[in-house]
Design a protein with these regions (language model features):
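Residue-level signal for mature regions of secreted extracellular proteins and peptides
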Residues: 11-12, 29
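C-terminal "post-core" interaction segments
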Residues: 211-214, 218, 226-230, 234-242, ...
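P-loop NTPase catalytic core of nucleic-acid-dependent motor ATPases
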Residues: 245
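Flexible, low-complexity junctional segments that flank or bridge functional domains
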Residues: 19-242, 417-437
């Protein structure tokens, strides 16, 4: 089964990572092992790495393909120490995320780190079982199928033990508390979840004029373009003067989607100018290419944008910040981003997809290499206490306050260390797969 070129990605979820553009077909070597056996895959994928890996000169000269019991073990052994982003996924899982935008589950993402007694809901996919059960951002899950959240942590229960197998129809009982302290007891059943990436589009009145708010999470994927077209049509109709773009939980994805989003924001301000350049290793310098801002119907023609960030703001999301910065005033509110100024052009072989780092990204000024993340202009701790667009959200409230006053204000005071402390060096796959149910 020959490898075929897939999309170029800047990020991933369960799977791939970030990138975007020009791909070339590589022909797998004849490894001498049974086709698609583990040693064969190890040999073929290592050969791909030797050719296209950004840090190919840091690889060992050769490997013993029989020394590893999986392609993941091989990659973990040979990867460059700075690389926490390259990874493998099964092709079906890759396609489900980037192309089909589906998974089997209840349809929500949660944060389990900020409260020992609750899973706090980050976002809920439209039309999912979670939405039908009344779950929304800011709700606190306190009991899942008879397990308290403290029990889950104390007993180190697996995701499958708590939420069940990834099978349609599997049902659990849940208890959750709304922000107004209403307690809900209900059931949810797993189904095929169609994932959306635009979670809210609205207008917030302010002293700075009409402020558009766009919550864009969960990736820069195939359906995103149509969602963004609809969102910016709505914002343009409202004649917004400013934009707050919420990228707090967006791990990235297609460079092409990032280019379209940036063009919607800047419009005539940067039309035809360089958004980003993808630079491959010296063996593949002929694959370097530049993505420019393009003319978009309903573009906002802004000279300033405020972007909400966390350490889960990654890859293509960071590309938006870095790519817009030479052309307009970019204000970030929240905390430092994840630090992924590199991307992948995935390679497929034997129904496995290798998303290895192939290129770095730089803006029109040649700026990149932000492996410690992009610092926040105004540092504010992310607290999930309300639904999208609510000014009870301290990060959104700080962003609106910045537009009203031109400064970070008291809410962000005393938190400046957040802007210079690098985010945790989580492996990228862990960052993208955690807490999606």
């Amino acid at each position: 089964m020959l490898k075929k070129s897939l999309v170029v990605l800047l990020s991933m979820t369960t799977l791939a990572s970030c990138g975007g553009g020009n791909s070339e077909t590589q022909t797998p070597i004849e490894s001498g092992f049974a086709m698609c056996s583990v040693p064969d895959q190890n040999a073929v994928f290592f050969e791909f790495l030797q050719n296209t890996y950004l840090w190919y000169d840091q690889l060992p000269a050769s490997i013993d393909p029989e020394a590893y019991n999986s392609v993941n073990a091989m990659l973990d052994d040979v990867r460059f120490e700075q690389d926490r982003f390259s990874g493998f996924s099964e092709k079906q899982a890759f396609d489900d995320f980037f192309e089909n935008a589906t998974f089997v589950g209840f349809g929500f993402s949660s944060d389990s780190a900020s409260d020992p007694n609750a899973y706090i809901v980050r976002y809920v996919f439209g039309g999912s079982a979670a939405e039908q059960a009344g779950l929304a951002r800011g709700d606190r899950l306190t009991n899942i199928n008879g397990f308290s959240i403290a029990q889950i942590a104390d007993q180190q229960l697996s995701n499958e033990t708590v939420f069940g197998p990834n099978e349609e129809g599997f049902t659990i009982a849940v208890t959750f508390t709304k922000p107004d302290n209403t307690v809900v007891n209900t059931q949810m059943s797993k189904s095929a979840v169609g994932t959306n990436t635009v979670f809210a589009t609205q207008v917030i009145p302010s002293n700075a004029g009409s402020v558009g708010y766009l919550s864009f999470q969960n990736g820069f994927i195939e359906p995103s373009d149509d969602e963004l077209i609809a969102a910016f049509a709505e914002l343009a109709t409202q004649n917004v003067d400013e934009l707050i773009l919420d990228l707090r939980y967006n791990p990235g994805g297609r460079v092409s989607v990032a280019g379209n989003l940036a063009s919607f924001i800047s419009g005539s301000v940067a039309d035809g100018e360089v958004f980003t350049t993808l630079e491959y290793n010296d063996k593949n310098a002929d694959r370097d290419f530049t993505v420019s801002f393009s003319d978009r119907i309903n573009a906002l023609d802004l000279t300033r944008v405020v972007i909400l960030t966390t350490s889960s703001t990654c890859s293509a999301s960071e590309l938006i910040i870095n790519g817009l910065a030479p052309h307009m005033d970019v204000v970030t509110v929240g905390s430092a981003t994840c630090g992924k100024p590199v991307g992948q052009s995935p390679d497929e072989y034997c129904d496995m997809v290798l998303s290895a780092i192939n290129f770095r990204t730089v803006n029109s000024l040649g700026e990149g290499d932000y492996f410690d993340g992009l610092p926040a202009t105004c540092s504010v701790e992310d607290q999930i206490v309300a639904d999208w667009g609510s000014l009870d959200d301290p990060v959104l409230a700080a962003a609106v306050d910045y537009l009203n006053t031109g400064s970070c204000g008291l809410q962000a005071a005393g938190k400046s260390l957040l802007s210079i402390t690098p985010p945790p060096k989580l492996h990228y796959q862990a960052l993208l797969t955690e807490h999606l149910h």
